[in-house]
C-alpha cells in the first residue's frame, strides 16, 4: 500500500495536467474538440499542438456534411497556427457547394460563400511555402474550384475540380 499510493498520486496528477492542457487548448482555439468521431486522420505538416486534432475534426465533419462545424474546426486550427496553409484549404473546401444547400436539386453556393472560399483558397496559396508536397498538391487542386466571381456559372469550375481531383486521387491512392 505504501508503494501503491505514490504511484496512484503520480498517475492521477498526470491525468489532471493532460485534462487542463486540453481545456487550455480548447479555450485558446475557441472551439470544442469532440469525441467519438472515429479515427480518420490526414497527417499535416503543422507541429503546433492541437492543430492536427482540429484539422482531422474539420475533415471528418466535412465528410459528414456538417459544414458549419467543419469550418469552425478549421478556423480553430488556423487560430492555433496562422501559417497552416492546409488549414485554410480545409475551410475553403468546407465552404464549397454541398448537398445540404441546393436549388432545383443542384448544389449551390451563396455569393458570400463563393467570396469567402476564394479568399481562404488564396490565403492557403499565400502560405503554400509552409506546406508539405502532398498539402501543396491538395491546395493547388482545390484552386480550380473557385474563381471569386459570384456571377459566373459553377459548372465549368465543378468540371475542372472533378478532373483535378481525378488526377490527385491517382497520385495519392490513400
Positions of PLM-derived features:
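Short coil/linker segments at helix-helix boundaries
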Residues: 20-84, 88-174
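Sec-dependent signal peptide recognition
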Residues: 1-7
Amino acid at each position: 500500500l505504501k508503494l501503491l499510493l505514490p504511484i496512484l498520486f503520480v498517475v492521477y496528477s498526470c491525468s489532471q495536467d493532460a485534462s487542463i492542457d486540453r481545456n487550455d487548448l480548447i479555450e485558446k482555439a475557441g472551439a470544442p474538440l469532440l469525441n467519438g468521431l472515429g479515427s480518420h486522420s490526414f497527417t499535416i505538416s503543422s507541429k503546433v499542438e492541437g492543430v492536427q486534432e482540429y484539422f482531422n475534426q474539420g475533415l471528418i465533419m466535412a465528410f459528414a456534411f456538417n459544414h458549419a462545424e467543419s469550418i469552425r474546426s478549421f478556423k480553430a486550427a488556423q487560430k492555433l497556427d496562422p501559417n497552416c496553409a492546409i488549414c485554410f484549404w480545409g475551410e475553403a473546401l468546407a465552404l464549397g457547394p454541398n448537398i445540404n444547400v441546393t436549388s432545383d436539386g443542384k448544389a449551390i453556393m451563396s455569393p458570400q460563400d463563393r467570396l469567402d472560399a476564394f479568399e481562404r483558397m488564396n490565403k492557403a496559396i499565400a502560405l503554400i511555402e509552409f506546406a508539405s508536397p502532398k498539402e501543396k498538391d491538395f491546395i493547388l487542386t482545390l484552386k480550380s474550384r473557385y474563381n471569386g466571381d459570384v456571377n459566373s456559372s459553377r459548372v465549368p469550375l465543378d468540371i475542372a475540380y472533378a478532373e483535378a481531383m481525378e488526377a490527385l486521387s491517382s497520385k495519392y491512392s490513400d
